[in-house]
Each structure stands twice: as C-alpha cells, then as structure tokens.
Amino acid sequence: MSKELLALQVWPGKVLRVSTGDGDVHALVEDAGAAPDGIVVDSRVAYWTTMGTPTTDPDTPGEAGQDFSRRNGGVHAFPLDGGTPREVLPAGAITTGKQLTSDGAGTLYWGDREGHRISRVRTDGTGLTDLVVTPAGDGILGECVGVAVDPARGHLYWTQKGPAKGGQGRIFRTGLDMPPGENAENRSDVELLWSGLPEPIDLHLDGDWLYWTDRGAAPDGNTLNRAPVPAPGTHGRPPEILATGFAEAIGLAVDSEAGLAYVSDLGGHIRAVPLPDGPAAARTPWDVVTLPNPLTGLCLLP
C-alpha cells in the first residue's frame, strides 16, 4: 500500500510531501527556512530543524566552503491538516540543527552539529535542555549529527560523524534522564557503541535494531546499515550493510510493516531498500523519486 514521506530540500528550503507509490511530490511548506535538515511528525504536526545560513568562502567550492558555526539555526512547526507555520525555537536559538526525532509524547530531540550537543525541547517551545555537550576542543570529532530515542528503555542514541570521509565516525548511547549531580558536559553513563565508522549520519531505532545512513568513503560508506542494539555495557556488533551507492546518504525512515527503509541523499534521490526477512525482501532497491536539488531529512507519515 502506498504511503507518504516528508522530505527536506536544502536549497531552497522546502518541506516536500512524497508518495511512495508513484513518486508524486508537492510542497507542504514552500519556505522552510535556511538549510532544513531534520524532520519528524508528532500528533499531526511536522517539526523540522534548520542549520541556518552559513558563512561562505568564495575560494572554496562545495560544502567545504560553508561555515555553519554562526548561531542561527532553529526548530519549526507546521500542522499537516493546514494552518500557520510557527517557531518552536526561532533562528538563533540553536547553532546547527541536524536530525530531529520525537518521543511521541510531546518532546523533540535533535543533534546540534557545530553546537557540539544533543538537546531537547517540548513541542510548545518550553523546557529547552542540553542532554549531551561534547568538549569544544574535540573539534569536528565532537560534532553531533544523528539522534534516536528509546523511551521504553530510557535511552538516547547519537552519531558523531567525524571529518568528511575520515573513517572516524562513532555512535553513542546514554540515558534520557541525567544522573543525579551530573550535567550535560560530564556524564558517567555515556557508552561508545561503535567507532571507526566511515561517516555515520542519521539514525532510526526499530525494535531491537538500530539503522543508520553513512555518507563516508566507499566501500563501507554511502550506505544504509543496521546492527542489533547492544546490551548495556557492551559494544555493538559489526554492522550489516543493506544498500550501497548513495550520493551522500543523509535521511532515513523505516517502515517495518512493509519491510522497507527509505534513504534520501544530497543527489536528490529517495531510494526504497527492502529489509532482510521482510515482505519485500525478494525485491532489489529502487528509486522512489529523483529531484534536481539536494535532500536531507526524511520521515514517514503515520
């Protein structure tokens, strides 16, 4: 059965509604702000982050010439059934908003890349709290990107992708609740689950499996990966690569009922990837749609 995705177009910033059946695309939000990156739906409202407007070096082409360290990112909202867009956190409230997720109970979580942190806020804009802050001295190694939450087990997962194509990416886990007497800069419950990854980006937790996109160097980068969620105090098993050949893989949505994962990339593609042992396992991956502009965040409409 055909379902719908929400996908983010980076430049110019738009929220797109995409049919998984025929690839039909239309804009849900025509002006989504500067460089939208992470998106999630909670209670029929779409929420997304923006990275903000970068400072550009005209002598350095591409992403390498874009500096997002200026604090002008935000978190934004739009009701799916129509209405007026609103600011959950206005531009400048965060530094560089990356993947966004929800606990399904009115709290949003996201990675702030140049801000070196994982934060949360209620959907009404109250209760802004940092859960993890990495040392500024870690530089690019401390930049937080992807995020997933497991409210049932009380866990938070996130990626630190490291330098581009650098093979120094990591995935961490910590508690959703702060240990007594500790703070976001110094937590005793942080676990390093995977290290030495090509360049992990967005996460999706589905039951006992953790899925992630990776935009690092081939052969293990520009891939969709999954691995079993490690037991507390243990490291993750080597990931299983489910699909390769993406053009800078970013966004990720998993439809476990249909046995499909959807991946968006900076090449403008949204690809459907059948999951092992699922109802579509006999199929090969296929493109749902190819658009002329880069795509980042992705979520499945409930």
Where is each model-derived feature located?
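Blade-level signature of beta-propeller repeat domains, shared across WD40, Kelch, NHL, RCC1
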Residues: 264-302
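Structural motif
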Residues: 12-17, 56-76, 116-119, 165-174, ...
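An edge-strand/N-cap motif at the start of beta-rich repeat modules
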Residues: 1-27
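A short beta-strand motif characteristic of beta-propeller blades
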Residues: 24-30, 84-90, 127-138, 188-194, ...
